[in-house]
Amino acid sequence: NTNNTIEEQLSTLEKYSQGRLGVALINTEDNSQITYRGEERFAMASTSKVMAVAAILKESEKQAGLLDKNIIITKSDLVAYSPITEKHLATGMSLAQLSAATLQYSDNTAMNKILDYLGGPSKVTQFARSINDVTYRLDRKEPELNTAIHGDPRDTTSPIAMAKSLQALTLGDALGQSQRQQLVTWLKGNTTGDHSIKAGLPKHWIVGDKTGSGDYGTTNDIAVIWPKNHAPLILVVYFTQQEQDAKYRKDIIVKATEIVTKEFSNTSQKK
């Protein structure tokens, strides 16, 4: 049973990493799953942003022109790591621009502006419940949601819950068709993911992803993947460590990706 050997390989990787690793892969061809600590809670860090943007997209189904709505950004709004919003203090940004900045550059002020518009982090949790995700919980804004304290349930989910939600949002019918296409387009245009899941996959595969990082060396990535000649895959890799100031370990994300996707790169080469 290859599943066992995959789990054994992930366990070996985790021991080597000296951290805690969570993985969930869904093969959408038959909805089969590979998981490792798939039901355990991990701090999401910026991977939480996909659900927040999806909540805005859902609102836009009911309100024509919502994404064009201009949001004022003041100097006092700015929080650490806001490469796009800091350039738009004079003009403000539309909800569409804020969504793109949130997903493609992981701009923290943009995320906070989206949360403010929705009515706070709890509204994102409510949206998650509405798409049948009972695990996801968003409790705080940026940058506080990245504290990733061991055992703290705030701003966490499980790998399998996130994988199922990402599948519903990008490939299922949790969003209307044009909203789903917009989300996928934004994810495919991500600028932060080249050294994470993408680096563990064959070059010609198409990937849309959202990275995340936080305290305790928390290093995350969630992705929808289109292999050559194969139905899409959904992959969530969450990783966290013992020391609060531990270094990020994108190499662990890459290795975990290689382990769980190997069988698909083999089939796509054969065809």
UniProtKB/Swiss-Prot annotation:
GO terms for biological process: beta-lactam antibiotic catabolic process; response to antibiotic. Pfam families: Beta-lactamase2. GO terms for molecular function: beta-lactamase activity. Substrate binds at K210, T211, G212. Signal peptide: none annotated. Monomer. Belongs to the class-A beta-lactamase family. The class A beta-lactamase family has a specific amino-acid numbering system, sometimes called Ambler or ABL numbering and often misspelt as Amber. A multiple sequence alignment was used to derive a consensus sequence and then the consensus was numbered taking into account insertions and deletions. This allows use of identical numbers, e.g. for active site residues, despite differences in protein length. UniProt always uses natural numbering of residues, hence there appear to be differences in numbering between this entry and some papers. This is Beta-lactamase. It comes from Proteus vulgaris.
